């Protein structure tokens, strides 16, 4: 499951997660809407390996700014609260899975 989080939840959950994938997106973004079901599927297939979160850049712009998000969708892979890799734009599930596994 991909959990939508606000700023407080991000600090309390995503930043404290051992390994997390954060999806920075917006409701009006077409590629973001295409990516959402891909991430849901991956979150089920990779359950127990990492936590999946979604941040709406319009609702929490300060987080987007902190992570240098200038284009969406933007995926940030985090380990122990620190970003380790970033992917911008839509990618099919198999490519995303390979990217994640290559960075965790």
Please annotate each region the language model reported:
Residues 58:
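Adenine-nucleotide cofactor-binding loop residues
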Residues 2-20, 61:
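A short beta-strand-turn-helix
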Residues 18, 25-28, 71:
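Short pre-active-site segment immediately N-terminal to redox-active cysteine/selenocysteine motifs
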């Amino acid at each position: 499951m991909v959990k939508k989080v606000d700023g407080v939840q991000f600090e309390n959950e995503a930043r404290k997660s051992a390994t997390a994938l954060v999806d920075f997106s917006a409701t009006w973004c077409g590629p973001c809407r295409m990516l959402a079901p891909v991430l849901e599927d991956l979150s089920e297939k990779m359950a127990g390996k990492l936590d999946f979160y979604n941040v709406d850049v319009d609702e929490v712009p300060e987080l987007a700014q902190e992570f240098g998000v200038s284009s969406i969708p933007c995926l940030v892979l985090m380990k122990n609260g620190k970003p380790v890799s970033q992917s911008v734009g839509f990618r099919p599930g198999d490519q995303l899975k390979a990217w994640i596994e290559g960075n965790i």
